[in-house]
Amino acid sequence: MALKPLTHPDELYQLLREGDVKEFNLRKAQLDRIKLNDCDFRYLDLRGIDAQRVDFRNCYFHNTDLRGIDLSQASLEGASFNSARISGVLFPKDIGAQEIILSVTHGTRVRYLK
């Protein structure tokens, strides 16, 4: 059974859907950890987002502009980056380059190295 991305009712998710990265970052700074797993981020421009300690597990980033984002402290298990723009993205060190290439090229879900 295929997983379908959610359109999350969370206010922080809605800010990203509306393209308000600045307000997202301001509100996120007041929180310890943000849970946005299983969400649909397809076709969004997320440049400038503070992604530290954000749970993006099982999210769809199809054709999403992620250029320059630091994802090194984000949870990305099962996320798909099909055709995403990833120039300058810092991925978690536990996700291998081949995993990222497969996800961007073929839409596979990323797995962490054990």
Q: Where in this protein do the model-derived segments appear?
A:
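Tandem repeat scaffolds
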Residues: 4, 8-114
